[in-house]
Amino acid sequence: MSAETAAANTATAPVPEVQEQESSKSKQVNLTPAPLPTSSPWKLAPTEIPVSTISIEDLDATRKKKNRTPTPKSSTATKWVPIKASITVSGTKRSGSKNGASNGNSNKSKNNKTAASSTSSSNANRKKKHHQHNAKKQQQMKKDGFESAVGEEDSKDATSQENGQSTQQQQPPHHRNHHHSHHHNSNGPQRRKFHNSNNAGMPQNQGFPPQFKPYQGRNARNNNNNRSKYHNHFHHNQQHPQQPMVKLQQQFYPVQPVLMAINNIARQIEYYFSEENLTVDNYLRSKLSKDGFAPLSLISKFYRVVNMSFGGDTNLILAALREIVANEAATVNVAEGTLAAKEGDNVTGEAKEPSPLDKYFVRSKSWSNWLPETFETEINIEKELVGDALDQFMISLPPVPQQEEESSTELASQEQETKEDSAPVAAGESESSL
């Protein structure tokens, strides 16, 4: 028994070497670094296709494909039928006893609608007859020789618009837009507004129409002898309700907008050659000759002058030039001469139509301060114009017909007679009442 127990104890007892190995393995831990990540957590763009190599054409093609809307497919069985609209009126449900009243109300509303439509149609017919009657009257008046009177009635709206424009032009106008070539060639800043300094010393009522101020130039000296020959004639015409008409470009215009246009053009021409404008107007300075003159035909193509002269009417521009020549206090000189032709001017070979503005030239009185470095324009001056040299371009006002004066006197006498007749009747009634 002792031998068996000894063998069992040896089998169950642990071996010391094996225990030491196991304890050493448990104490030693192998630490290895983590592997590098294969994909970025921020989801960056792949480096296989760089952004610089992507063509814009491919992007446009993809955008067009995305923006394409699917086209509807129509089969042969599709049939388009027009819609027949039916008007339905919604209302509250009522009992059978009230249906009769509702039907009666609906019938009354229908009758009212038909009556209103009939009255509107009758009014429309009356208006048509009235317009036809007026048209016949106008035709008859034209045949009898009263075309000017009819033209005045038709041009009331046009004159009101022109008066509004002319009053706006009477105010200091903004920097004018020159011809299209001026827009491309001028490099200066925007021009200042044109301030008219001659309105302070002018008399208010000189017999001219309302809002009309006779031209006295930019530097007025309160001269009453300003050679304005429109004064006496228009003072006589202002007493009559109808303004005389002036014929320009085969059309008749009232006198008031015509005279205001002449004055505005004269002031605008003086502004172009003022120190305020020439300091910034490189285009106009480049067109000056060695004597400081600029062609009037060039100035007439400027934007503001074209608008003020009813589309570039030469009669209005020459009338404004006459006002400048007749004004002793004008800030510009006007001369008569010829423009020397240069080689290469007429490249197309077309003959240029002559204009009455071609022989007139304008310059500032301080022209020596604004001469350009190189002269593009050559002008042969014949003489300077002063006084009444251009009186032939003054627009003549038509005389007032005497029939209007006779009719006005007859109306005044009739009113006096009616007043005299009514006075004793009132006195008799008062005596009978007492």
Swiss-Prot record:
Chain intervals for the UniProt region annotation (Disordered):
1-243, 396-434
Q: Recite the lineage of the species.
A: Eukaryota, Fungi, Dikarya, Ascomycota, Saccharomycotina
Q: What is this protein called?
A: RNA-binding protein SRO9
Linked residues for Glycyl lysine isopeptide (Lys-Gly) (interchain with G-Cter in ubiquitin) = 156, 301, 342, 352
Q: How does it assemble?
A: Interacts with HAP1. Component of the HMC including HAP1, SRO9 and YDJ1.
Q: Entry's PANTHER family?
A: LA-RELATED PROTEIN 1, LUPUS LA PROTEIN-RELATED
Q: Where in the cell is it found?
A: Cytoplasm
Pfam families assigned to the protein according to its UniProt record, in alphabetical order? La (PF05383)
Compositionally biased spans, kind Polar residues: 26-41, 158-167, 196-208
What the entry lists under InterPro entries is as follows: La_dom_prot, La_HTH, WH-like_DNA-bd_sf, WH_DNA-bd_sf
Main function:
May overlap in function with tropomyosin and may be involved in organization of actin filaments. Acts as a multicopy suppressor of RHO3 mutation. RNA-binding protein which may modulate mRNA translation. Involved in heme regulation of HAP1, as a component of the high-molecular-weight complex (HMC).
